[in-house]
A protein has these predicted regions:
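A short, Lys/Arg-rich alpha-helix, primarily the initiator
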Residues: 1-19, 25
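Hydrophobic protein-protein interaction segments
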Residues: 119-464
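Short amphipathic recognition helices of helix-turn-helix/homeodomain-type DNA-binding modules
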Residues: 1, 35, 45-112
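Intrinsically disordered, low-complexity, charge-biased terminal/linker regions in eukaryotic proteins
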Residues: 17-20, 53, 209
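DNA major-groove recognition helix of helix-turn-helix
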Residues: 12, 36-40, 59
Length: 479
């Protein structure tokens, strides 16, 4: 046992804290902490400061609760003061010093880095544990924006992904992943469209860019800059059968630099972007110069607003600290939408859950402006929807009962804007957090066509109900 393991074990015994409780607080599986205590293993060097700080806080809190500060000082040869903050600092320094001694005396030191910085995973359980548990924990410990490359085809993995348990924790630092996609490989029909959509929704705190990958699919690499690289062997079903893990930073970054050159702009098919970039590329101007639209709304309903709302949105833009260009954009979009609603064809897909939430809280996001409609404004909005849909019979509504989508209703966060020539996704949740993309723009004509076709087919799904002007009025009168 090394110095770090000895100290950690002694602290656990002194505080009598349960290993399961400690693991839950620190964010690591109990097997990892057990190995740190008994097997001479150490937390990853990059993660160690955060791990030690978390451990120190836990132990200090327990010592104060148990009123054992004086005994701790005698047992661990520590001096006062004995308040919780000071105890935490003392324990952190003890752990830090023990970690350094242990690191210098194990095969993880710099002299043996070439031998110890690689390992091979051969069993499915180990491979799954690495990607599902160990890798996310490692990314959570990083104190910097995370840049990741994955040369493999996302569509090859979609069929095996499960979202039943949901996410336990979301990233607080920006995570950006460049990933491969091959529409001619595992994406030969439209079945992958909802799977890809659910994937983006499930990881809506991560920004993805997808690149056509036929030229690099053979590499089978997953690389986290400044951290770790994984070279994978895939079986005939595109499942990872062997994972070769590299943690030597120099090797990892050499791989990253070489592989990153394969992700060229000409191969970009789906791109995460912010509001400024979306506007620059015409998604808030030329996008509306068409006459056919498919719009799937995942939050509120910012369309068919009564005229008196537009000045209030403009004022809200100013009140929320946007510059005058946002107020001008809101004014322009208001006029543009009024013209579109008069005669163009619009298919609105509205989630039942989001519709009920809008009726309850009235929140909409118009462009980038968050606005809460009052009950009276919501009533005017509904009346205006009825009036405009009667005036323009090309406006159709499809209510998607997302409660019938087993384990999927918590996974629909992105709204879809499509004119069959250009398509982008909007992430309403991003306006309430600090990570994740605001938008995805779809740059592949083939992908736009397939998504358009999928939305057309969605109209005939059992969980999708059609409402034209008359049935909408009947529904309103009833409820």
């Amino acid at each position: 046992m090394n110095a770090y393991g000895t100290l950690l074990k002694k602290l656990i015994r002194f505080t009598n804290i349960k290993l399961t409780n400690l693991a839950e607080i620190v964010g690591y599986d109990t097997s990892y902490i057990s190995k740190w205590c008994n097997k001479g293993k150490l937390p990853a060097a990059k993660a160690a400061p955060n791990v030690n700080k978390c451990l120190a806080d836990v132990f200090a809190r327990e010592i104060i609760i148990q009123e054992e500060a004086t005994l701790f000082a005698a047992e661990f040869n520590a001096s006062g003061p004995y308040d919780e903050s000071s105890l935490s600092s003392t324990i952190f320094q003890l752990l830090k010093d023990a970690y350094k001694r242990s690191y210098d005396n194990t095969s993880e030191n710099a002299q043996l880095a070439g031998l110890s910085s690689q390992r091979m995973l051969l069993w499915q359980l180990d491979i799954k544990n690495f990607f599902v548990t160990e890798l996310p924990q490692l990314l959570h410990q990083l104190n910097e924006p995370c840049q990741i490359l994955c040369t493999m085809d996302i569509c090859g993995f979609l069929k095996d992904l499960s979202y039943e348990t949901g996410r336990q924790a979301y990233y607080t630092n920006p995570v950006h992943i460049k990933m491969g996609i091959n529409l001619g490989g595992h994406c030969k029909n439209n079945s992958y469209i909802p799977q890809l959509y659910y994937f983006l929704n499930h990881y809506n705190d991560i920004s993805f860019d997808f690149y056509e990958n036929t030229c690099m699919d053979y590499m089978n690499l997953f690389i986290v800059k400044n951290c770790i690289a994984v070279q994978c062997a895939l079986d005939k079903d595109y499942r990872i059968s062997i994972a070769h893990i590299i943690t030597d930073t120099a090797q990892v970054n050499s791989l990253y630099q070489k592989v990153n050159s394969e992700f060229t702009l000409s191969r970009l098919m789906i791109h995460s972007s912010d509001s400024e970039e979306l506007f620059y590329n015409g998604y808030r101007t030329e996008f509306y110069a068409h006459n056919t639209f498919q719009i799937m709304v995942a939050k509120g309903f910012e369309f068919l607003l009564p005229p008196e709302i537009n000045p209030r949105l403009i004022q809200a833009a100013r009140d929320q600290g946007f510059d005058e260009s946002m107020a001008q954009l809101v004014a322009h979009l208001g006029i543009t939408w009024e013209e579109i609603f008069e005669k163009n064809t619009l298919d609105f897909y509205v989630l039942k859950s989001s519709l009920m939430k809008y009726i309850d809280d009235g929140e909409i996001i118009f462009a980038d402006v968050i606005y809460h409609m009052t009950p009276e404004e919501r009533k005017l909005h509904i009346e205006n929807v009825l009036a405009l849909s009667k005036k323009n019979r090309n406006i159709q509504f499809y209510v998607v009962d997302d409660e019938q989508l087993v384990n999927k209703q918590q996974m629909i966060h992105f709204s879809i804007f499509n004119n069959r020539k250009k398509l982008f996704l909007k992430n309403p949740g991003r306006y309430h957090t600090d990570v994740g993309p605001y938008f995805y723009s779809v740059l592949s004509d083939q992908l736009i066509q397939r998504i358009s076709s999928y939305l057309d087919d969605l109209k005939n799904a059992d969980y999708c109900s059609h409402y034209d002007a008359e049935s909408l009025q009947t529904f309103y009168d009833k409820y």
